[in-house]
Amino acid sequence: MRQLLPGDTVWRNIRLATMDPQRQAPYGLVDNQALIVRGGHICDIVPETQLPVSGDNIHDMQGRLVTPGLIDCHTHLVFAGNRAAEWEQRLNGASYQHISAQGGGINATVSATRACAEETLYLLARERMMRLASEGVTLLEIKSGYGLELATEEKLLRVAAKLAAENAIDISPTLLAAHATPAEYRDDPDGYITLVCETMIPQLWQKGLFDAVDLFCESVGFNVAQSERVLQTAKALGIPVKGHVEQLSLLGGAQLVSRYQGLSADHIEYLDEAGVAAMRDGGTVGVLLPGAFYFLRETQRPPVELLRRYQVPVAVASDFNPGTSPFCSLHLAMNMACVQFGLTPEEAWAGVTRHAARALGRQATHGQIRAGYRADFVVWDAEQPVEIVYEPGRNPLYQRVYRGKIS
């Protein structure tokens, strides 16, 4: 009989999808198990028969499914306003250029966000965060990028920090100052990149406001040379990097990010075999964002088969943002990744657990249920993990556990 220490908490009588690749069963499944939690971490996984029949802090889950807490590794959660009218214009035939000339596009969100009070931004972001948490998300990446000036980029990162401090969720904040060229630098994008590299990155890093630097390397974003300046600046300061790359065209952004051992290359619809090989060599995770693919009615799919062949880890994320992926649902992203991109349900689950953790540099502590990892997990009214992927809109979450506490 397993002896429990005072303060231990146990979840017993569970079907456990560990997502541990060392377990041979699909999803790392093991039946009739119990989880022992101590000090906010998983202490042990033991067979049900090794536990006392009852006791304090022992929760009987009556055979329910338990998985790691979900991880959304790519979001733009903090912004003001929406772009619904712009979307309607596009569907009525207006071009992106026409909408931009009217003040639409990303700079519309930038203007609204700059004008928005910090507390209002917090309340807007918290409501979105709670929607994700209600689906079982326990770790969430949040990018800046709707400030495009020092003061507002800092404001967005402070909101992310407050979300982490005041709610039962982990936040991984990312500086995405190199998201777009702001209106005041329209004719001088190189000058804006200088501002990013010489002012924003070092000053905001010194304040401890972010974990990684991101950029948008694309024909409608920044070119390879401009992107490399951002990567060089970050790496010189010891900051992990990642990139929005190969979404609308093939510029070689994935190879560039991988040369700097990037945490992830995101979107990657136009990724080629050389880029896939570079990602393998750089230890870079591929992050699929099917919401943007769907919303923009794109047709070029990511090279999933090449990613499998080169054994590049693949994550899946919501990319929640007002312009190209207004879907605040990781369950929906999992379903879309299967239906649109051809992932298996097990690959989609890996994409929101252990591979998403790797995309955030948290693979040693998050994304699996195993001894020593954080006690962030979800209890579902379901028998199989595929049920959560299969039916978006139905949420069978029974219990969300964060740092060993029911939340």
Curated annotation (Swiss-Prot):
Family the UniProt entry places it in: Belongs to the metallo-dependent hydrolases superfamily. HutI family.
GO biological process: L-histidine catabolic process to glutamate and formamide; L-histidine catabolic process to glutamate and formate
Residues reported to bind Fe(3+): 74, 76, 244, 319
Protein name: Imidazolonepropionase
PANTHER family noted in UniProt: IMIDAZOLONEPROPIONASE, IMIDAZOLONEPROPIONASE-RELATED
Cofactor field: Zn(2+); Fe(3+)
Amino-acid positions noted as binding 4-imidazolone-5-propanoate in the UniProt annotation, renumbered to this chain: 83, 146, 179, 247, 324
Domain of life from the UniProt record: Bacteria
UniProt-annotated location(s): Cytoplasm
GO MF entries: imidazolonepropionase activity; iron ion binding; zinc ion binding
